[in-house]
């Protein structure tokens, strides 16, 4: 009896991961009615990550809280928590609080959108005793270097007159000092290089949260390799997609360099502005690296580990994976290549299904990523 594992990413704009998987299962059952089929949703750290983990783990709790949206509006967001060997874990997507779809097209302006709500989500999870965080940082509407998140977590981001800087990339331009409400106990990329703020600068709640944060770990699902600044930095590459015109893009890159200067002049021998992924989500990756000891990791690797998909791969004879488009980019850390890599580790036959096959799909076959590639109107790898 044929045993088939279906683990496909969402077909964006058409089907979620689970919907696509169940559709494939129906087709398999028509052709191979006696086969055993397991459908497992997967994702690469962006849209659908929490859904994939919910399916892959037991005793997952749904959490909700009210946070500040990218335009300063109040909105309700969801995330999940569960107990893991490494400690109580929170899984959240930054796009829930600061995603581009939350901003009407005519109001998109990364000079003013904020990640404050991301910090509020983290703060809520800390209050619920979470100590391990998995955070997807794709799909952002922001370019604020993560200072909104820091402000929500109790950091003082101040201008030359000691006033809080405004939301958004605009705040980076006038930033002169960042004060932490605590000195962390753990090592790594933390904020221990900042002195504790002046008395009265932070509320007791902020200090309590910050002290708990110093013992938290952050695994950041990040699939872009862009640095914080420069030609390939977040401002020049991603800000136009978020509503910035050419003049604003150049100004934001200047502001981002100033932000990095403010941070790094306080750190002897430490700089993450050119670290791959530091420019993710408008510089949010940089904030996680420099202030919270975050580890940037390919999202699919996190999902595969957290969901225990390897057990299902070992069970199967054939593994079917896929996403909306199979092309040269598929091999660069995207969901199908991650699933295929795990399947090949166990000697499984791998079939990829895409909504379409783009340039470079043939390379996925030639380099042995997949045994076959299917799309609606094209097939590769079949004699």
Model-derived regions: residue spans:
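N-terminal loops that bind phosphate or other acidic moieties
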Residues: 2-137, 141-383
């Amino acid at each position: 009896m044929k045993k088939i594992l279906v683990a496909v990413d969402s077909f964006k704009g058409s089907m979620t991961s689970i919907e696509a998987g169940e559709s494939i299962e129906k087709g398999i059952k028509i052709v191979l009615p006696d086969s055993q089929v397991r459908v497992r949703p997967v994702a690469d750290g962006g849209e659908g990550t929490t859904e994939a983990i919910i399916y892959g783990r037991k005793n997952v709790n749904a959490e909700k809280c009210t946070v500040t949206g990218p335009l300063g509006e109040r909105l309700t967001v969801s995330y999940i928590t569960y107990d893991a060997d490494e400690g109580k874990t929170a899984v959240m997507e930054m796009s829930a609080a600061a995603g581009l779809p939350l901003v009407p097209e005519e109001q998109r302006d990364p000079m003013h959108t904020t990640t404050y709500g991301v910090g509020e989500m983290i703060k809520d999870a800390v209050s619920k005793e979470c100590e391990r965080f998995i955070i997807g940082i794709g799909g952002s509407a922001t370019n604020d270097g993560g200072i909104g998140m820091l402000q929500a977590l109790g950091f003082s981001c101040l201008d030359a007159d000691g006033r809080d800087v405004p939301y958004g990339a605009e705040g980076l331009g006038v930033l002169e000092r960042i004060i932490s409400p605590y000195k962390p106990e753990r090592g790594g990329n933390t904020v221990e290089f900042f002195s504790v703020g002046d008395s009265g600068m932070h509320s007791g709640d902020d200090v309590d949260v910050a002290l708990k944060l110093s013992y938290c770990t952050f695994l950041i699902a990040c699939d872009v390799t862009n640095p914080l600044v420069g030609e390939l930095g977040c401002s020049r590459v991603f800000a136009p997609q978020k509503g910035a015109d050419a003049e604003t893009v150049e100004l934001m890159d200047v502001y981002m360099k100033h932000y990095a200067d403010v941070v790094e002049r306080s750190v002897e021998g430490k700089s993450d502005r050119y670290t791959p992924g530091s420019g993710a989500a408008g510089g949010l990756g940089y904030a996680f690296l420099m202030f919270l000891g975050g580890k940037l990791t390919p999202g699919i690797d996190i999902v595969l580990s957290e969901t225990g998909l390897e057990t299902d791969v070992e069970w199967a004879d054939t593994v079917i994976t896929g996403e909306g488009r199979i092309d040269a980019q598929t091999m660069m850390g995207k969901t199908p290549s991650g699933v295929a890599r795990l399947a090949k580790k166990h000697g499984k036959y791998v079939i990829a299904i895409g909504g379409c096959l783009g340039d470079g799909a043939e390379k996925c076959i030639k380099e042995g990523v997949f045994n076959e590639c299917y799309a609606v109107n094209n097939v590769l790898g079949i004699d």
